[in-house]
UniProtKB/Swiss-Prot annotation:
A molecular-function term among this protein's GO annotations: cytokine activity
Classification lineage: Eukaryota, Metazoa, Chordata, Craniata, Vertebrata
A Pfam family annotated for this UniProt entry: Interferon
Alphabetic keyword roster: Antiviral defense, Cytokine, Disulfide bond, Secreted, Signal
A single cellular component GO annotation: extracellular space
Gene name of the encoded protein: IFNA16
SUPFAM superfamilies: 4-helical cytokines
Primary role: Produced by macrophages, IFN-alpha have antiviral activities. Interferon stimulates the production of two enzymes: a protein kinase and an oligoadenylate synthetase.
Native species: Homo sapiens (Human)
Protein localization: Secreted
Keyword Lipid biosynthesis among UniProt keywords: no
SMART domains: IFabd
Protein name: Interferon alpha-16
InterPro entries on file: 4_helix_cytokine-like_core, Interferon_alpha/beta/delta
Keyword Secreted: yes
Cysteines joined through disulfide linkages: C24-C122, C52-C162
Length: 189
């Protein structure tokens, strides 16, 4: 799906805002971003959960990656970033754009893009660019494998409306888990 001019302009403005902002307030930023993303995901639902019960699937969400007791702030930021990047990639496909209302999907893209920018600024501030890749390989790999399972599920179900509904609910669940980690980090600060 080609992104509309207005969407691209909004992304440009949000990028500029992120670059110009100083400091990293992960708990505040991530909590608000997650809340907005969850609201948009809820609005995107087109069919009843009950009509898709037969399509439910356990994607094996890597809960250990989002356990607030095991992570330092920089590691958590890196895990959040990967989850949001993979969510953006998943919902940016041609098959995804056919499944959802275009206006809501554009708003969801913008929200995810804003969160990615905020998290990139935070992770760079917390640990520096060189250390990011080495620090969190296992957790990033776990998140990538999780999203690979989601993608394979969608392919196996031929991107059916119920398959997308199951995935939408799963992504909402994953955003809720990351919110719990964020709360744990707030208690540590």
């Amino acid at each position: 799906m080609a992104l509309s001019f207005s969407l691209l302009m909004a992304v440009l403005v949000l990028s500029y805002k992120s670059i110009c902002s100083l400091g990293c307030d992960l708990p505040q930023t991530h909590s608000l971003g997650n809340r907005r993303a969850l609201i948009l995901l809820a609005q995107m639902g087109r069919i009843s959960h009950f009509s898709c019960l037969k399509d439910r699937y356990d994607f094996g969400f890597p809960q250990e990656v989002f356990d607030g007791n095991q992570f330092q702030k920089a590691q958590a930021i890196s895990a959040f970033h990967e989850m949001i990047q993979q969510t953006f990639n998943l919902f940016s496909t041609k098959d995804s754009s056919a499944a959802w209302d275009e206006t809501l999907l554009d708003k969801f893209y913008i929200e995810l893009f804003q969160q990615l920018n905020d998290l990139e600024a935070c992770v760079t501030q917390e640990v520096g660019v060189e250390e990011i890749a080495l620090m969190n390989e296992d957790s990033i790999l776990a998140v990538r494998k999780y999203f690979q399972r989601i993608t394979l599920y969608l392919m196996g179900k031929k991107y059916s409306p119920c398959a997308w509904e199951v995935v939408r609910a799963e992504i909402m669940r994953s955003f809720s888990f990351s919110t719990n980690l964020q709360k744990g980090l707030r208690r540590k600060d």
